[in-house]
Amino acid sequence: MEQLSSANSLFALELFHTLSESSPTGNIFFSPFSISSALAMVFLGTKGTTAAQLSKTFHFDSVEDVHSRFQSLNAEVSKRGASHTLKLANRLYGEKTYNFLPEFLTSTQKMYGADLAPVDFQHASEDARKEINQWVKGQTEGKIPELLAVGVVDSMTKLVLVNAIYFKGMWEEKFMKQDTTDAPFRLNKKNTKSVKMMYQKKKFFFGYISDLKCKVLEMPYQGGELSMVILLPEDIEDESTGLKKIEEQITLEKLREWTKRENLENIDVHVKLPRFKIEESYILNSNLGRLGLQDLFNSSKADLSGMSGSRDLFISKIVHKAFVEVNEEGTEAAAATAGIATFCMLLPEEEFTADHPFIFFIRHNPTANVLFLGRVCSP
């Protein structure tokens, strides 16, 4: 499981960098876990160079028996009875006249719980699009009502592969609504906007990375299996959002080092965190292309013969939409598709005032998997 968590987290950071390059000062929010799961299903049906590129981009090449690892991980992450709601759902929508290989369909069902729903892309692509959107809307409690925009599928579409993830968690320590006030949020050195700033003082895991002048705060959700971890620079020191230095330095080893419990102290923290709601939509072809995944999107080069026995399939688009809302009660999120840090002595009480841009992720603690990763530049 650890190999797969590392592979997924490494991919998460690499994709974060490409999204940040495309939008240097914008909000970012996505589910690397959802994207990796969806492309692992594609990986089942790829061969040759296409398979090699996919394996390298997602670091599946460092994981033994990747599909059964995903099977265990998906089961572990979406265990029933937890005090949060975390739902994963996969489904394949295939052109009903097209012959997919039975062994491909058996494997996606067994490893990813993904059934094939036959639809009529050829003669009724708009109906098929609506059906897919309706399913995703149901899986994400209405938070992602339209995954596929008009025109994304057409009469030539053979396969749409959908992964949806939905999360709703209550803070272990809730903020009191009466403590929320209007406060300025600094977007950069010059501009501010007014936000609803929540406040509480409780014991939290807190750390400080001195070479980056950055605070680390872990806020657990009820049940303790999931946490939101926030990286907040002490101040805005660059001409942009103030996150440049962290973004340039962040690696998987460092992120683990900075955010693991042993390196944090459980102390009283005055937490000020804005309420925020982010909805992002990405077509990931060019971002994944920059990470080395190219043949998959090229009709003359893609080899998905493990799905159909022939070479006539390719993936035209990878669409990912994600939604997160953070308030006094907790968080609702959905998505469809090592230098050792030196920690310094902390005071008995610390201030954590998120009144300027920060990076955050939602982690499944038992498996150390990053389920969602984001950056708040303008709440």
From Swiss-Prot:
| UniProt modified residues of type Phosphoserine | S300
- UniProt site (Reactive bond): C344, M345
Q: Which GO terms describe its biological process?
A: cellular homeostasis; inflammatory response; negative regulation of cell migration; negative regulation of interleukin-1 beta production; regulation of innate immune response; regulation of protein catabolic process; type B pancreatic cell proliferation
Please give the name of this protein. Answer: Leukocyte elastase inhibitor A
Member of which family?
A: Belongs to the serpin family. Ov-serpin subfamily.
* SUPFAM superfamilies named in the record: Serpins (SSF56574)
Record GO terms (molecular function): peptidase inhibitor activity; serine-type endopeptidase inhibitor activity
Give the protein's function.
Regulates the activity of the neutrophil proteases.
Q: Has UniProt tagged this entry with the keyword Chloroplast? A: no
Compartments where located: Secreted; Cytoplasm; Cytolytic granule; Early endosome
Q: Which UniProt keywords apply?
A: Cytoplasm, Endosome, Lysosome, Phosphoprotein, Protease inhibitor, Secreted, Serine protease inhibitor
Q: Looking at the UniProt record for this protein, which Gene Ontology cellular component terms does it annotate, in alphabetical order?
A: cytolytic granule; early endosome; extracellular region; extracellular space
Assembly and interaction partners: Monomer.
